[in-house]
Design a protein with these regions (language model features):
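Carbohydrate-interacting/catalytic domains
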Residues: 1-196, 201, 205-231, 293, ...
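Aromatic- and acidic-residue-enriched carbohydrate-binding clefts of CAZyme catalytic domains
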Residues: 188-213, 241-289, 316-353, 512-523
């Protein structure tokens, strides 16, 4: 027995899944000679109970055996594949041939009786024992014709009994490989990001100064977020902001006395990572925010940025946690050509034990206040072994905590962060705009890396505004949101997406007047109730529709079920997702025009078996965006673009 898949680094890291996720498993099973072989996988649940799942041979020439495994509870599981010699299968195969040919008839029938007698020595229900005893008697009944005797030993009920409780010889087990099963939010969810200080802020004309939003005013925005159908509210850092080298608007070096600074420059005389920026409120206010989110069905995700402003308390209490340059000054953060004079990066080399302990204490502070999801800023700039230790240690007492890696870096580092514990990862989605790029990327994410990495797709963030979004207009913003919401189970939206905030800061791929450095009053009161005023762009309704579609269709809750479909036009992408669970068969087809400037007319060609249909079958194609329906088959004409909806999200309704 060889080539067990899935297997993460030979079993050094766990296979990842969530409860109910269907994991395809395979192995190559063979032996010398011509005797029959068989295989099963033994799943050991967190309580130590064993569950045996048979494998099915799917390619005899390649000795390939396959099955699907599913876990019904969270926790640390293991899986072990066992290949074994199958005495009953060997006898059934040989006897069928020889008895029909009249070769060694009595000998073969007696050997069959003896195989069944060996099976009687195993623990079996009385009904099964009676079945086997009757078959043994028939095999040895010389008054019957040989064919009838053989039929008794190979009857369907006998075959089923050996399939359920096989007679196994020469069992060859694999090691017990680790399998981590987590809650569904580790794979599936819709995120919404905002800066709390902007929610409820306003410009005071009387004083000429901005008045900050607070955690209490930010909580007033939560009903709108929940109404759009999001599952997670993600807060940028809420800690005290440093005053030394504070950045001004658009990342300028000289902040005014009233400029709020970047929340990623963490720490001041008011505290560090375990404190709250006083202008935002108190821990009582934070607890209120979390409680309000929970009341509305939202989970709170908190940003962890392990870096410090020059006036962070750690700078004076633990100078060894930072890098000292030759002139005696502490090195600020750089990513040439970018410079971050308001941030000191941590150096884990000098006192790793001290830093580890403090980070663990800090994380626990927020867990104790109801946070179960952490979005980690730039984890690839910290030691991998630190994250492995921290995530593992937290999981010992809080296994429901989820970690999202904001690591736009090399694939090897992204993969390693996922293997050591991060449940989710940001991706290159924002920069994958061509059809071939998206299809190639999805082939990778849904197969090669799906055993350990769960992608999160974001069309924009507070750091990212690609040229496609800058110049694509409303069609581009619809397409990128719809693709993010349907390609993968987890996606995120940065606040302001509803307003199509597409103006960039010259020379960089981020918004002008970036919210990282200033307040932004979006005047939500102008849009509700009753929607936008005439002439105003508004995408909240579209986002709500996407999230309603996601919630209603289990096919969109999973990653491994993505399948590429075909379209004649290279600017039109077509794919499908299908999920079968019990009696429900849910199938979705997505057709998207990737050219936001032109309406495209083309033909799509569907792999009907991937949809659970025959090649000549027809079905009702219900567009979940517009409510329209069409009669579709294998080949279908579509029209998508700026003069029509740029994306079809089709529910397959079988006749």
């Amino acid at each position: 027995m060889t080539t067990v898949t899935p297997l993460v680094e030979g079993g050094d890291f766990p296979l990842k899944a969530v409860v109910g996720e269907q994991i395809p498993l395979s192995a190559k099973v063979f032996r010398e000679g011509h005797d029959a072989v068989n295989a099963n996988v033994v799943l050991t649940d967190p309580a130590g109970g064993e569950h045996v799942v048979p494998l099915t041979r799917t390619n005899e020439g390649l000795s390939l055996w396959e099955t699907t495994i599913v876990a019904d509870r969270e926790g640390d599981w293991t899986y072990r594949v066992e290949g074994w010699s199958d005495p009953y299968g060997t006898w059934e195969h040989d006897a069928t041939i020889k008895v029909e040919a009249g070769v060694d008839v009595d000998l073969m029938l007696e050997e069959g009786a003896r195989v069944l007698e060996r099976a009687l020595n195993q623990e079996r229900p009385e009904s099964a024992q009676r079945l086997l005893r009757d078959a043994i008697a028939a095999l040895r009944d010389e008054d019957r014709p040989p064919a009838a005797r053989l039929a008794a030993g190979t009857a369907p009920e006998v075959v089923r009994e050996f399939a359920q409780r096989p007679l196994r010889e020469h069992v060859s087990p694999s090691p017990d490989y680790p399998w981590l099963v987590e809650r569904q939010r580790a794979l599936y969810g819709a995120w919404y990001e905002f800066f709390p200080r902007s929610e409820g802020c306003y410009y005071d004309e009387a004083t000429g100064e901005w008045v900050t939003g607070t955690l209490r005013t930010a909580a007033k925005r939560l009903p709108a977020v929940a109404d759009m159908g999001f599952d997670v509210i993600y807060l940028t850092p809420i800690h005290p902001i440093g005053t030394i080298n504070r950045k001004g608007p658009n990342n300028t070096l000289n902040a005014g006395p009233k400029d709020p600074g970047s929340p990623y420059a963490i720490g001041s005389k008011d505290g560090g990572h375990d404190a709250i920026e006083p202008t935002l409120g108190t821990f009582e206010d934070f607890d209120f925010f979390v409680a309000e989110a929970e009341r509305l069905g939202l989970e709170v995700a908190m940003d962890i940025a392990l870096q410090c402003a020059p006036d962070h308390p750690w700078v004076t209490s633990h100078p060894e946690w930072f890098t000292t340059r030759a002139d005696g000054t502490i090195a600020y953060a750089e990513n040439p050509p970018k410079k971050y004079q308001d941030i000191y990066p941590l150096n884990f080399d000098n006192d790793p034990a001290g830093i580890y302990a403090e980070m663990r204490r800090m994380v626990q502070v927020w867990i104790d206040h109801g946070v179960k999801i952490f979005r980690v800023d730039n984890p690839h700039t910290k030691p991998v072994e630190f994250w492995q230790w921290l995530i593992t240690d937290v999981a010992q007492t809080h296994p429901d905590v989820i970690w999202l890696a904001e690591a736009f870096t090399k694939p090897a580092m992204m993969a390693t962060l996922a293997k050591v514990g991060f449940q989710q990862s940001y991706t290159y989605y924002a920069w994958r705009n061509e059809r071939w790029e998206l299809e190639e990327y999805m082939e990778e994410l849904s197969t090669q890396t799906a055993d350990y990495m769960r992608p999160s797709f974001w069309p924009t963030t507070h750091d990212i505004l690609t040229p496609y979004m800058q110049y694509g207009g409303p069609a581009a913003w619809k397409v990128r949101a719809a693709l993010a919401a349907t390609l993968v189970p987890t996606y995120g939206i940065y606040t302001g997406y509803e307003l199509l905030e597409s103006v960039p800061r010259p020379g960089v791929e981020e918004q002008i007047d970036n919210e990282k450095y200033e307040f932004k009053n979006r005047r939500w009161e102008d849009y509700a109730p009753g929607g936008p005023k005439e002439g105003q762009l508004w995408m909240a309704d579209y986002l709500r529709t996407l999230n309603e579609i996601r919630a209603a269709h289990p096919a969109l809750h999973w990653l491994r079920n993505w399948r590429k479909q075909s379209a004649n036009d290279e600017n039109v992408m077509c794919f499908s997702k299908r999920h079968v669970d019990g009696g429900r068969d849910d199938t979705i087809i997505v057709v998207a025009n990737l050219d936001p400037h032109t309406t495209r007319e083309t033909w799509i060609h569907l792999d009907m078996p991937e949809l659970g249909l025959g090649w000549n079958d027809g079905f009702v194609a219900k567009d979940l965006i517009t409510g329209e329906s069409w009669q579709w088959g294998q080949h279908n004409f579509v029209r998508v673009g700026r003069d029509a909806e740029p994306v079809h999200i089709i529910h397959v309704r079988r006749f």
